[in-house]
């Protein structure tokens, strides 16, 4: 997992994925990446204390 400041999330996620994460509407792509995480495209992300924790889905 890579921790990134909330303001930097668009570097890692496409805009519509970012919006879906904020609205908790991401749909899982492929296998789930991690429990309680949302998967968009080939990324998996969840928020803790205003930080995004991001990794590639595999």
UniProtKB/Swiss-Prot annotation:
GO terms for cellular component: extracellular region. GO terms for molecular function: ion channel regulator activity; toxin activity. It is found in: Secreted. Keywords: Cleavage on pair of basic residues, Disulfide bond, Ion channel impairing toxin, Knottin, Secreted, Toxin. Expressed by the venom duct. Disulfide bonds join 26-40, 33-44, 39-57. Coiled coil: none annotated. Residues 1-25 form a propeptide. The keyword Disulfide bond applies. Mostly non-hydroxylated. The cysteine framework is VI/VII (C-C-CC-C-C). Probable toxin that inhibits ion channels. This is Conotoxin Am6.7.
